[in-house]
């Protein structure tokens, strides 16, 4: 199942933070990325990016990280332009079938390249995948963004996380997703955080 993500203008009164989505599809940048990123900035909405991965090897992951960094550079985006991390979106079943050790190596390779460039990396995946296909001890230095749609008060993972995508069926006034729904997330911050 493939997902298509889009974003149009939403006021800061409606939403305190947003991750601008930079989705890799056959090597192409999301066609709305430039507009979304710019409009989020105008509206003082927190901005980050994520990169959808198909990498099955560490070599592929390094290429994807370099491609992600190239796209950021082409847009004139440096680490100070982002309020949120650069997320590595890993959810392809074909990648998971390569095994826990390899999935972890692919993930850390991408994240290490992003970190070396001065950006903050984050790992995004579903709760089941995070439990079954990652060696947590090797990814825990990165922020974790877990997708888990549940009525429970927290996602079902046995370790800490920084962001929780809790629904893909939200309706937000001003959000033109093309599908009628938006994802919503909780981003956990220190209680002493000052905006």
Regions found by a protein language model. Give the residues of each.
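Aromatic-lined carbohydrate-recognition surfaces of secreted/lumenal glycan-active proteins
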Residues: 114-132
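Hydrophobic anchor at the start of a short beta-strand
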Residues: 47, 120-121, 144
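Basic/polar, cationic surfaces and motifs that engage anionic cell-wall
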Residues: 102, 123-124, 135-142
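Glycine-rich, charge-decorated loop segments at or immediately adjacent to ligand/cofactor-binding or catalytic sites
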Residues: 60-63, 129-139
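Substrate-binding cleft of extracellular glycoside hydrolase catalytic domains
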Residues: 1-111, 115-117
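Functionally critical loop-and-helix segments that line ligand-binding/catalytic clefts
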Residues: 2-5, 137-195
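Short, solvent-exposed loop/turn segments at secondary-structure junctions
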Residues: 93, 128-130, 151, 168
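Short beta-strand/turn micro-motifs composed of small residues
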Residues: 51, 125, 148
